[in-house]
Design a protein with these regions (language model features):
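Metal-cofactor-dependent catalytic cores
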Residues: 1-53
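Solvent-exposed alpha-helices and their adjacent loops that cap or buttress functional pockets
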Residues: 20-23, 38, 50-52, 112, ...
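SAM-dependent methyltransferases
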Residues: 41, 47-57, 82-85, 115, ...
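Glycine-rich phosphate/diphosphate-binding loop of Rossmann-like nucleotide-binding domains
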Residues: 52-98
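Short beta-strand segments
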Residues: 60-61, 121-122, 180-182
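N-terminal small/polar loop signature for handling phosphorylated ligands or for N-terminal nucleophile
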Residues: 82-84, 89-121, 126-140
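Proline/glycine-rich low-complexity loops and linkers
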Residues: 133-216
Length: 216
């Protein structure tokens, strides 16, 4: 019995030599929902998987000032609120500076180790030299999913011509969908309200939980 996506917490010698820890990839995997203990020899009852498990998400806010405590993060909590209302389980939130290396590391960890279904970032999608979110997102992608970012730009242009200035990306890494949202709470709300009704189906297809979305 081991946790889903178990990580190496000590940067062990094996990882340093091979670049990858040797972790179980088969067997009984579990996620801790409530604290407790399990011991060798304990009897374990396996329950059947849920027919319609909730989608799991993570939210990353990118802000130099926010990471230094100079600005309150309002967009991240708003995204969590909207995702929760839509039925997602938000498993992690974090506030990072506008640093590509740190963002790429977290995107890889959340997609590969935590295996969340959806990662939403907020901030860092404009023209400032420190706006590196799209580049970091593309760098970790396996496949592009441009329609989501294009839909957000289309919707934003119906509100303000400045919508054309968004460089937001939407990609897939493995079975995880990663979408860049704007930085301002107002723009976050407008964009997320627009894409959320259709987003879940795409997330479920990527996760292997739904079939394709062809129209009859």
């Amino acid at each position: 019995m081991t946790q889903i996506g178990k990580e190496c917490h000590n940067d062990c010698v094996i990882k340093q030599q091979t670049g990858e820890c040797i972790m179980p990839r088969e067997g009984v995997f579990a996620r801790v929902l409530k604290g407790g203990e399990i011991h060798v020899g304990d009897e374990v009852t396996l329950l059947p998987p849920l027919e319609d498990p909730p989608l799991r998400a993570a939210v990353i806010t990118l802000s130099d000032k926010g990471s230094r405590g100079e600005r309150e993060d309002k967009s991240g909590p708003l995204i969590v609120e909207m995702l929760t209302a839509a039925g997602y389980v938000v498993e992690e939130t974090m506030l990072l500076p506008d640093e590509a290396k740190a963002l790429k590391a977290q995107l890889i960890r959340l997609a590969d180790s935590r295996q969340v279904n959806l990662i939403l970032t907020t901030g860092g999608t404009g023209f400032s030299p420190r706006d590196i979110t799209p580049e970091a997102t593309y760098a970790v992608a396996d496949r592009n999913a441009p329609g989501i970012a294009e839909a957000m730009r289309y919707h934003s242009l119906s509100i303000t011509p400045r919508g054309m200035l968004s460089r937001a990306a939407s990609v897939l890494r493995g079975k995880t969908l990663i979408v860049n949202l704007p930085g301002s709470p107002k723009a976050v709300k407008e964009n997320l309200e627009y894409i959320l009704p259709s987003l879940g189906h795409g997330v479920r297809i990527a996760a292997g939980l739904d079939g394709e979305c062809a129209r009859k």
